[in-house]
Amino acid sequence: MTKFQEWPDEPIDLLCGGTPCQSFSVAGLRKGLDDPRGNLMLTFGAIGAKYRPKWLVWENVPGVLSSNGGRDFGTFLGMLGQLGYGFAYRVLDAQYFGVPQRRRRVFVVGCLGDWRSAAAVLFEQESFKGDSSARWGSRTVHPCLTAKGARAFDDRTGYVLEEQGIRTTTPLEHERLMGFPDGYTLLPGKRSPDTPRFHALGNSWCVPVVRWIGERIEQVNRILESR
């Protein structure tokens, strides 16, 4: 990433990437931009300055919002603004995209010269209406006591136990937690130890979340091109 000046000068439509989260995570030392890994956030912006794509997508942990009192994140957004990008950001949680894990991440979407289009990607019109509880069917009841609702089954997930306690998860289960196809981190014809597979999946993006963002960009871009 730091060698981007050596990359070919080819036009691109979308720059998509994330930078190391350890500098911003509340579980780390939180050195922010003082950490070389955290400073890669600005390198991402420099890549945008070189290629000037129409769209940018950047990701990190929610801790980036409060790192150094929010000044680190503000520096990044200010850089995008100076480059001519309108932008929007939102915290998205993978559990609401069809995978069984809570994984909250900050996503920044930038659109060259147009913040409204960037916001339209991350914020659907329906999202401003809030969520309401599902309605029960209408019914006429006698004005007296009615029985409380009850379940005839236990819908809680059971524990998976081994002889010595709760077992560890497998790379296959991690692939499914992240929305990858089964065996995606296996290298055909090569030995694939579990540890590198865990690291790769832990540093990756949740597939359904990225797919949703990509589809939203496609929809908004189609509208822009039709004008």
Locations of regions flagged by a protein language model:
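Short, hydrophobic/glycine-enriched beta-strand segments
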Residues: 14-16, 179
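Class I S-adenosyl-L-methionine
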Residues: 3-14, 21-168
